Design a protein with these regions (language model features):
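Short amphipathic alpha-helices in soluble, non-transmembrane regions
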Residues: 36-42, 100-108
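A short, structured loop/turn motif at beta-sheet edges
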Residues: 48-49, 92-95, 122
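Glycine-rich beta-strand-turn "strand-cap" elements at beta-sheet edges
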Residues: 1-15, 52-80, 105, 109-136
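Surface-exposed interaction/gating patches
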Residues: 7, 11-34, 38, 49
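Amphipathic alpha-helical interaction segments
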Residues: 46-49, 98, 111
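Short, well-ordered beta-strand segments in beta-rich or mixed alpha/beta enzyme
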Residues: 20-27, 66-105
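Positively charged, small/polar-rich N-terminal and surface patches that mediate targeting and assembly
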Residues: 33-36, 41, 47, 53, ...
Length: 136
């Protein structure tokens, strides 16, 4: 598959998603590799249950930008010992999100991974936000 075809497929997936959930948490640097393993396994399950896309990011800059406060100040992460992670899950619509969430909730492996994940993050650091696509 050519690079342009891959780009077209990714653009189609972006167009058909109308809801994205953002999950943000703090992770001790010593738990980085364990978290990556959990993310890889969870990503496989997410694809199995039809998530349009699941992406993971690590905060790479802690500098403010002009009049914008960097998220690292909002979540109060200790940059020497902790990382800030974000997971994004894309859905077609709220019905798709509900179906996906129900399937994941009934999956023993996903429940096991969720418990491992929650034990590895900094307590009290998990925040979530769901956003709907704006037509601009």
């Amino acid at each position: 598959m050519s690079k342009s075809n891959v780009t077209e497929i990714e653009e189609e997936k972006q167009i058909e998603s109308s809801i994205v959930q953002h999950f943000i948490c703090q992770v001790s640097k010593k738990n980085h590799d364990a978290m990556l393993q959990i993310a890889k396994q969870a990503n496989e399950i997410a694809r199995k249950y039809g998530a349009l896309r699941v992406e993971y990011f690590q905060l790479s800059s802690t500098e403010n930008m002009i009049d914008w406060t960097n998220i690292s100040k909002t979540v109060s992460a200790n940059q020497d010992e902790e990382e800030v992670w974000m997971e994004q899950v894309f859905y077609r619509d709220s019905k798709h999100r509900d179906e996906y969430t129900a399937m994941c909730g009934n999956d023993e492996n996903m429940n096991r991974l969720y418990k491992q994940f929650m034990n590895l993050i900094i307590p009290g650091s998990a925040i979530v936000g769901e956003f709907s696509r704006l037509k601009v």
